[in-house]
């Protein structure tokens, strides 16, 4: 019998403004427990933290075990931008009034430029946070109903058909020493195909706690082992007869399920071997082949594309603002250079070295403009270049001010020397006049 024509639906709940979609799994088959009586689901969810890395939180009530996880198919953007809040101030606070005004303008220039860069970086961080918030709104809550060992053998027909409806994935389990549960698997598959809905997936899990996972590539050893022992391979004509000491050949079982295109896993509830792989395999099958989950994935990708387009538009606007700021900064820079030239002229400082510095600064401004044009496609790089340009301008200002201060100190020193010489000459003349007057008095 084929599966029902009804399509699978996904129930949606709202929790803290997040859309949570319910993914339902049903576990059926024989009794699969560890030596301590712990079921495979409990072992997977509760007793090994290494096996629940993909899950946020979970709770268990009676036969239901629920846990939440983020739908990891949605890509997320996590970009951290380094923000340079450092502002370089001039140390020449003891200069004349003109020099202090020059420092004040220079500090305002740096403050404005750094504030603009910080605003642009904050805009980028806000856009990235919006992307992460949009992605986190899509979550999947997985609901597992464990009916293994509740309905087996003659009671298999007593399971109501409503148990199969709305189930996205089925886990058929059996123990390697329980040939009855193994031989009932064809009935379970037939039941699932009869009552389940489209796009539902099946995996078969065998619990083998006595030995390690066999090598399925060794086909020769499997035929010899099956002939030398009372192992019953699975087929639809096998009768459910209890045979003492009979087990299941996992290699033959694996070949059979491969022919049915059903994934088959050998796990160990005692050692946790392959348990995580089995659950994740079923989750992947459902996500990759179910058009409903593909729709949510595409919807999430569209949201990310829209957010990226908005980020690009914001980056372009930020680049335009940066260009305007750079133009204003260049004008302020030229005005500051003119103030420095006037100050040097008033103090009779040689203008040749200062003019050379101005030419170098003009070249730096041209390079800054080229860098700004090249960095329009990347706002973060543009902000970093602006900070570097500010540092270069500050260094140039400081060098010019140091030169000016040194020249003023030299002039002041020379002036003091000249004053001392003049005072000494006046003192010498007075001494000579006193000596002359003394000589005249003696002669009289």
UniProtKB/Swiss-Prot annotation:
A biological-process GO annotation = exocytosis
Q: Does Acetylation appear among the keywords?
A: no
InterPro entries membership:
P-loop_NTPase (IPR027417), Small_GTPase (IPR001806), Small_GTPase_Rab (IPR050305)
Q: Where in the cell is it found?
A: Cell membrane
Q: Which UniProt keywords apply?
A: Cell membrane, GTP-binding, Lipoprotein, Membrane, Methylation, Nucleotide-binding, Palmitate, Prenylation
- Where in this protein does the record put region Disordered? 91-136, 213-232, 298-401
Q: Where is the lipid attached (S-palmitoyl cysteine)?
A: 439
Which residues are annotated as pro-peptide in the record? Answer: 442-444
GO cellular component terms attached to this protein's record: membrane; plasma membrane
Q: Name one Pfam family in it.
A: Ras
Offer an example of a GO molecular function term for this protein. Answer: GTP binding
Report residues binding GTP. Answer: 29-36, 73-77, 207-210
Covalently attached lipid (S-geranylgeranyl cysteine), positions: 441
Which spans does this entry mark as compositional bias, Low complexity? 95-135, 217-232, 303-399
- To which protein family does this belong? Belongs to the small GTPase superfamily. Rab family.
Identify this protein by name: Ras-related protein RabX
């Amino acid at each position: 019998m084929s599966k029902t024509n009804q399509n699978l639906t996904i129930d949606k709940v709202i929790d803290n403004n997040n859309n949570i979609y319910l993914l339902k799994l049903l576990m059926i088959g024989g009794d699969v427990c560890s030596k301590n009586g712990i079921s495979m689901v409990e072992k997977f969810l509760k007793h090994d933290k290494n096996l629940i890395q993909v899950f946020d939180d979970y709770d268990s009530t009676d036969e239901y075990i629920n846990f939440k996880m983020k739908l990891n198919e949605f890509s997320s953007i996590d970009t951290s931008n380094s923000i340079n809040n450092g502002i370089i101030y001039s140390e020449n606070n003891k200069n004349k009034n003109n020099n202090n005004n020059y420092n004040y303008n220079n500090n305002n220039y740096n403050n404005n430029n750094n504030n603009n860069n910080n605003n642009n970086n904050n805009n980028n961080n806000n856009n990235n946070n919006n992307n992460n918030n949009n992605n986190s709104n899509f979550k999947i809550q997985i609901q597992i109903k464990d009916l293994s060992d509740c309905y087996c053998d003659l009671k298999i027909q007593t399971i109501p058909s409503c148990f199969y409806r709305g189930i996205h994935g089925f886990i058929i389990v059996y123990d390697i020493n329980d040939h009855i549960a193994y031989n009932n698997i064809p009935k379970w598959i037939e039941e699932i195909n009869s009552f389940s809905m489209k796009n539902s997936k099946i995996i078969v899990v065998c619990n083998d706690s006595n030995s390690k996972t066999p090598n399925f590539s060794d086909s020769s050893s499997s035929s010899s082992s099956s002939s030398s022992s009372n192992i019953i391979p699975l087929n639809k004509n096998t009768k459910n007869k209890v045979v003492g000491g009979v087990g299941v050949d996992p290699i033959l079982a694996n070949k059979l399920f491969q022919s049915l295109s059903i994934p088959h896993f050998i796990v160990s509830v005692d050692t946790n071997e392959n348990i995580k792989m089995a659950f994740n395999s079923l989750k992947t099958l459902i996500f990759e082949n179910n058009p409903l989950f593909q729709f949510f994935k595409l919807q999430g990708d569209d949201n990310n594309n829209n957010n990226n387009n908005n980020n690009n538009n914001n980056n372009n606007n930020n680049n335009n603002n940066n260009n305007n700021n750079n133009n204003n900064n260049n004008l302020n820079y030229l005005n500051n250079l003119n103030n420095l030239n006037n100050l040097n002229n008033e103090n009779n400082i040689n203008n040749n070295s200062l003019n050379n510095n101005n030419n170098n600064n003009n070249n730096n401004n041209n390079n800054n403009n080229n860098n700004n044009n090249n960095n329009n496609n990347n706002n973060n790089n543009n902000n970093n270049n602006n900070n570097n340009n500010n540092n270069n301008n500050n260094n140039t200002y400081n060098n010019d001010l140091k030169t000016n201060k040194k020249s003023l100190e030299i002039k002041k020193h020379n002036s003091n020397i000249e004053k001392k010489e003049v005072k000494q000459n006046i003192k010498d003349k007075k001494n000579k006049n006193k000596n002359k007057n003394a000589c005249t008095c003696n002669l009289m």
